[in-house]
Amino acid sequence: MKLTILILEDEPEVRTAVERDLQVFAPTVRLEPASDVDDAWEVIDEISADGDVLALALCDHRMPGTTGVEFLVDMMDDDRTAATRKVLVTGQAQLEDTIVAVNEADLDHYIAKPWDRADLEATVRDQVTSYVADMGIDP
């Protein structure tokens, strides 16, 4: 079983930048990019089929046809992702959206764009560590 980080971002350049900034985790954690919500659910299906777990979802807010907050709320209704740590990475969420993310999606952290690489790495490390501890996984 391998821990996985989902990077849900519709803008290719931004998604690539997040992946690049998280390469430090690649030796021990599976990094899975997704360009939209449908793609994200397909990735989650693949993660489950491989016997791996989704430890962390890094999610943009504004995407075509939906929002990252709606996706994070939907994750709460899926047994495979309800315990996943959830981080909103955006520069466009309104206060109301953020409140919904916190109250209904159990948002664990918020990172504003543009992000600081060291802050992103520290947040990911903290969130994955919290997931491992919460789930009782032996690293």
Where are these regions (language model features)?
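Receiver (REC) domain active-site loop signature in two-component systems and cognate sites
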Residues: M63
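Acidic, metal-coordinating helix/loop segments flanking the phosphotransfer/catalytic sites
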Residues: E19, P33-L56
